[in-house]
């Protein structure tokens, strides 16, 4: 035997290992439809069974971490769809399958078609978020594409009536189950887009089996939803049901009732928000008015402080105080002189210088007379100055000017009217007189020739 021939000789272990590696590398995972037989579940929790058809069979194992995700318990004689890897059990040389997932045969084929269509449409970009249209807020009119006799329509209408009774609803009745259902759903979507009555559409139905919901896994329905110019909310089955329509739609709702919640406004909450905003507006208005009232009060106080009558009264009070002080000072001086005179008289009486006393007495009387005259002149001077000051204040007082026959006229904007350029025919003026106000309206404006100014004629 040559050296090359010797190197190609296998042991049984090496042969089984090589075959196992070849099967696992070349075959990978496969989908297999078959009938279950010899099903068993030992204490380990693993499943062991045989998959067969009418001409062959193969052993299969499904370990506990995989069979835990299966939604049914397999039965002998049941047709199933299995996704499995091919391997070889080296100790016995038996090739077998290691199952990863299992479904009843009918559902399994549909699920396989679902996955294939999902991958195809995803590759084309139909599920991309960039194609999703935003829902209108709020919706002005809602369209519902579903069965006219189904529970889904009743649920949608009930929620819309409860949340937003004023929201108009248009129903596009269609079959949602059966061979003709996909085409009818497509036509309903196209009709809604053609009529353009609604600004959002709810497309869906109530719950059911995978076969019942299969119309919403149809490629034609998916493309119709994608091509719709009106935003579409899918609402197919229950929350656990997922269809191709859910991936293509602009928004997926777990149930038809949830879809109605998404497209409608909660009128009670809206009223509550409006009431809250109204209350905040009233509080802001009250605060604004209070601020303006305080500002007006301060301005009124300042104006009152600057009024000519008040200023004149303050000056008059000051002059009266000065007059009282002057009179008190004069009286004090007179009392002092009188006391001094009395003391002098007492001293003179003691020495009895009659002639000197007579002369001093005359001098005192003269000084007293001159003092009284000086005090009187000074008081008259103060009175005269006080009268002049009062006259001057009265002369500059606006009320005195009005009393002499003058008036003050204001424009509609509140400005003083100084020139005819400030007014025009039809304007209303307010004129302040000594004893009140006069409202007048300009009927004609004439420009004087000498001064080139307008003459205002009012009525």
From Swiss-Prot:
- Gene Ontology process terms (BP): DNA catabolic process
Q: Where is it localised?
A: Cytoplasm
- UniProt GO molecular function: exodeoxyribonuclease VII activity; nucleic acid binding
Provide the reaction this enzyme catalyses: Exonucleolytic cleavage in either 5'- to 3'- or 3'- to 5'-direction to yield nucleoside 5'-phosphates
Which InterPro entries does the annotation name?
Exonuc_VII_L (IPR003753), Exonuc_VII_lsu_C (IPR020579), OB-fold_nuc-bd_dom (IPR025824)
Q: Which UniProt keywords apply?
A: Cytoplasm, Exonuclease, Hydrolase, Nuclease
What's the EC number here? 3.1.11.6
Keyword match Hydrolase: yes
Its GO CC terms are: cytoplasm; exodeoxyribonuclease VII complex
Principal localisation: cytoplasm
Its assembly, as annotated, is: Heterooligomer composed of large and small subunits.
Protein's job: Bidirectionally degrades single-stranded DNA into large acid-insoluble oligonucleotides, which are then degraded further into small acid-soluble oligonucleotides.
| NCBIfam families, alphabetized | xseA (TIGR00237)
Q: Which family does it belong to?
A: Belongs to the XseA family.
Record's protein name: Exodeoxyribonuclease 7 large subunit
Q: Which organism is it from?
A: Yersinia pestis
């Amino acid at each position: 035997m040559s050296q090359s021939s010797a190197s190609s000789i296998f042991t049984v272990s090496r042969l089984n290992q090589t075959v196992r590696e070849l099967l696992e590398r070349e075959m990978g995972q496969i989908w297999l439809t078959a009938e279950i037989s010899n099903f068993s579940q030992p204490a380990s929790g693993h499943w062991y069974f045989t998959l067969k058809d009418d001409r062959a069979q193969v052993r299969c194992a499904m370990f506990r971490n995989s069979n835990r995700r299966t939604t049914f318990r397999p039965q002998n004689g049941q047709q199933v769809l299995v996704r499995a890897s091919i391997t070889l059990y080296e100790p016995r040389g038996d090739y077998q399958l290691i199952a990863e997932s299992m479904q009843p045969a009918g559902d399994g084929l549909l699920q396989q078609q679902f996955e294939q269509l999902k991958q195809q449409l995803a590759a084309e970009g139909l599920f991309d978020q960039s194609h999703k249209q935003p829902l209108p807020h709020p919706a002005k009119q809602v369209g519902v594409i579903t069965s006219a006799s189904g529970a889904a329509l009743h649920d949608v209408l009930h929620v819309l009536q409860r949340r937003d009774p004023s929201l108009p609803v248009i129903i596009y009745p269609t079959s949602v189950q059966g061979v003709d259902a996909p085409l009818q759903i497509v036509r309903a979507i196209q009709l809604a887009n053609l009529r353009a009555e609604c600004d959002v559409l709810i497309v869906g139905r109530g719950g059911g089996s995978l076969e019942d919901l299969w119309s919403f896994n149809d490629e034609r329905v998916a493309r119709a939803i994608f091509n719709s110019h009106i935003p579409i909310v899918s609402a197919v089955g229950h929350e656990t049901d997922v269809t191709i329509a859910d991936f293509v739609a602009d928004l997926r709702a777990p149930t038809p009732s949830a879809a109605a919640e998404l497209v409608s406004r909660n009128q009670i909450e809206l009223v509550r928000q409006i009431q809250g905003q109204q209350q905040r507006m009233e509080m802001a208005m009250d605060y604004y008015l209070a601020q303006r009232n305080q500002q007006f009060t301060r301005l009124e106080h300042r104006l009152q402080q600057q009024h000519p009558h008040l200023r004149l009264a303050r000056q008059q009070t000051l002059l009266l105080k000065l007059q009282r002080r002057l009179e008190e000072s004069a009286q004090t001086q007179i009392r002092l002189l009188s006391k001094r005179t009395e003391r002098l008289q007492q001293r003179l009486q003691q020495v009895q210088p009659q002639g000197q006393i007579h002369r001093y007495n005359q001098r005192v009387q003269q000084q007293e007379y001159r003092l009284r005259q000086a005090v009187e002149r000074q008081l008259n001077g103060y009175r005269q100055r006080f009268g002049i000051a009062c006259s001057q204040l009265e002369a500059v007082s606006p009320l005195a000017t009005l009393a002499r026959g003058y008036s003050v006229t204001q424009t509609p904007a509140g400005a003083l009217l100084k020139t005819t350029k400030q007014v025009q025919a039809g304007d209303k003026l307010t004129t302040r007189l000594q004893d009140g106000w006069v409202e007048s309206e300009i009927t004609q404006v004439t420009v004087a020739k000498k001064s080139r100014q307008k003459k205002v004629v009012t009525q």
